[in-house]
């Protein structure tokens, strides 16, 4: 969801310097990394480490603004202004997200982002808690399949090149456990 927006704003190559596209073959929340595996190309946006890094790249002066932009994009893609955060899920993520917190501190310790970890995680946990229905997902998928254009109106959200790249990442990296 946010990947297309980040590509649109920064370009594919700029994003690829910070977030990779390699399938990990590991669980989505894996922390078992070594110093030589702590490089951006190993953190695709379909696993927690890559998604956390993606949150640092969203546009906005604050993380609340960054999240608001992401949520608005999802609402537009899904043609559903009612999409919102499931607050119970968000609170649970924030209160029990110890592995994600450890992972974020590890990423920061290795210089992969400079922002305050808790600000980044607030955005990440909120993004993980967005409640959508199957229709919403279908509309978002249609925008990607329709080369970055909205399903009903053909309004362009991002260039076809970015939609192709997001689709490729979904196909290659979306099956993270094998």
Task: Show where each model-derived region lies.
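Catalytic-loop motifs flanking and including active-site residues across diverse enzymes
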Residues: 1, 46-53, 133-137, 162, ...
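Generic alpha-helical structural context detector
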Residues: 56, 105, 139-142, 168-171
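Active-site-proximal alpha-helical segments within enzyme catalytic domains
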Residues: 131-150
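Active-site-adjacent helix/loop patches that line small-molecule binding or acyl-intermediate pockets
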Residues: 8-127
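Short, small-residue-biased leader/transition segments that mark boundaries at the very start
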Residues: 2-7
């Amino acid at each position: 969801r946010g990947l297309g927006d980040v590509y649109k704003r920064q370009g594919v190559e700029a994003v690829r310097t910070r977030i990779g596209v390699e399938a990990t073959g590991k669980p989505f929340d894996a922390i078992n990394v070594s110093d030589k595996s702590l490089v951006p190309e190993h953190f695709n946006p379909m696993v927690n480490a890559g998604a956390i890094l993606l949150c640092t790249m969203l546009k906005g002066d604050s993380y609340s603004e960054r999240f608001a932009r992401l949520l608005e994009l999802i609402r537009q893609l899904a043609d559903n202004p009612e999409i919102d955060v499931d607050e119970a899920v968000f609170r649970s993520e924030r209160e029990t997200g110890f592995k994600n917190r450890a992972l974020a501190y590890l990423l920061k310790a290795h210089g992969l982002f400079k922002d305050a970890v808790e600000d980044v995680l607030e955005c990440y946990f909120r993004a993980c808690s967005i409640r959508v229905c199957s229709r919403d997902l279908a509309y978002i998928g249609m925008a990607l399949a329709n080369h970055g254009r909205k399903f009903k109106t053909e309004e362009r959200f991002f260039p076809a090149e970015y939609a192709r790249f997001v689709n490729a990442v979904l196909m290659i990296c979306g099956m993270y456990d094998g």
